[in-house]
Amino acid sequence: MRSILRPFLIATLFIGCLATAATAQSFEGVLEFTKTTGPVVTSYKYYVKGERIRIEEISARGEVQGIMLVDTRDKTVTAISPERKLYMDVPNMRLPKDVETTVQKTSDMKDMAGYKCEKWVVKSGPEDRVLTYWVAADAFDFFVPLLETLNRKDEQAVFFLEIKDNKGVFPMLGIEQKSDGAEVSRLEVKKVTKGAQKPSLFEIPAGFNKFERN
């Protein structure tokens, strides 16, 4: 009986190890990117560790202007002002935006930020928008839950959530255009660094006070 069961036990253990390894391989590290809207260029950094993400907005001088701590498990967002040493909870009261779109996943490939990226195109006639994403697959499991937690109304986020089977990828380049081809905004990853992140990055710094609305 033992000899009969042994192969099944070994197979079960092997499958369990594979599942654990797959979970453990979720991306952890830093993504640095820019957002261009007209003449305005803003730099950002995403620090990622499991279900927690730290978003930093970087000034032209390289200084951190603002921070958001996002917990995709608890669906919470905390805004931090380094200059004023204040933090506040960001309520999520906005209803998800409903848009009518068509999605095309092409076979076009491009090398970007050290990744082979595939071209995905999302169009909406009623919204007068065409979104082109060049996506990389590297167990970026945090990204869709991040967009859902932030619940932003900008088209770069809204249109990406319209794509089926969008889990585990990250757009190394996202271009928003009007139907006539005029560019509205551009998100472009400049650098991806894998590596363990300190838990303290995702905590409110000591000595910071909570901002209370009157």
Regions from the language model: what does each represent?
Residues 18-24:
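Sec/Tat signal peptide C-region and signal peptidase I cleavage site
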Residues 25-214:
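Extended soluble regions of mature proteins
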Residues 1, 24-25:
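Absolute protein N-terminus
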